[in-house]
């Protein structure tokens, strides 16, 4: 059985499956219009890391580690609404967490956070807010269910695997690789510079706005739409887009540039794809 068949059998009622595949209709959550327009305003700038920290960095009820105790964080959870934000230290906010289900350890420079509590019906799981310092260079998240937000991260790698939930990465710089595996849910990237994005979406939309992709990048969607506004110009990228059932909307001749080292392969089984570019002429 293919992974698309599996997710349809597990997550989606039969009637909804036919409406999605037959009409290429995605209603998992709010998305931009097909023309790629969004409500987001992101400055066309190079990312820098300043020392202004989120107010959530207040120790309060939190487990903390100094910034020099680890350079990586690994997060495993059954269900939680996860928020990773910039902080001067590693901080796990415990205000709304069940301490019996929470484990935080530091091993060989890796902070391991495990939260085993199941989600209550009609909820997204407990809020799991984690502060990460600029010394943190690698983020790994594995979660059964829940939304994941990463803001103002500057490091080497991000690896996220989620069965059901949305993923949002904003105002971040990833220098080596960013791997996203999402079975049911959407993925959003805003105002970021990412090298080596590999996004595999089974059922959900992928939205990219004012984000520079460098190196080799792959965007795979089984059922869903791709709303793509890359930072820069068409000449900055070599783009190969393939849609089996659906439409590709782009005002530029993508075949003109085949020499850029920054390559983007887009593959959609059933869905639409819009491609645009964000630069000083249209900011």
Question: What are the residue ranges of the model-derived segments?
Answer:
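Positively charged n-region of N-terminal signal peptides that target proteins for export
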Residues: 1-6
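Short amphipathic alpha-helical "recognition" segments used for binding
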Residues: 7-10, 45, 248
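Short, surface-exposed interaction patches in beta-rich subdomains
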Residues: 110, 116-119, 167-182, 186-283
């Amino acid at each position: 059985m293919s992974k698309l068949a599996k997710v349809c059998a597990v997550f989606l009622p039969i009637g909804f499956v036919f409406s999605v595949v037959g009409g290429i209709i995605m209603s998992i959550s709010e998305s931009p219009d097909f023309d790629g327009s969004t409500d987001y305003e992101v400055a066309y700038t190079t990312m820098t890391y300043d020392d202004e920290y989120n107010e959530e960095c207040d120790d309060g009820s939190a487990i903390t580690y100094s910034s020099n105790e680890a350079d990586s964080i690994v997060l495993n959870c059954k269900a939680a609404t996860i928020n990773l934000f910039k902080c001067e230290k590693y901080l796990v906010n415990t205000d709304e967490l069940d301490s019996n289900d929470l484990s935080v350890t530091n091993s060989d420079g890796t902070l391991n956070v495990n939260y085993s509590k199941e989600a209550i019906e009609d909820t997204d799981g407990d809020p799991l807010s984690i502060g990460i310092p600029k010394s943190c260079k690698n983020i790994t998240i594995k979660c059964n269910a829940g939304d994941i937000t990463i803001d103002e991260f500057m490091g080497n790698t991000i690896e996220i695997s989620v069965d059901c939930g949305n993923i949002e990465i904003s105002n971040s710089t990833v220098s080596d690789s960013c791997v996203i595996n999402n079975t049911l849910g959407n993925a959003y990237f805003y105002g970021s510079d990412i090298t080596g994005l590999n996004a595999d979406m089974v059922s959900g939309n992928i939205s990219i706005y004012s984000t520079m992709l460098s190196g080799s990048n792959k965007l795979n969607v089984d059922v869903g739409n791709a709303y793509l506004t890359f930072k820069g110009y068409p000449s900055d990228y070599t783009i190969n887009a393939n849609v089996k059932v659906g439409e590709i909307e782009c005002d530029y001749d993508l075949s003109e540039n085949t020499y850029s080292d920054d390559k983007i392969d887009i593959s959609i089984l059933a869905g639409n794809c819009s491609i645009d570019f964000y630069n000083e002429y249209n900011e």
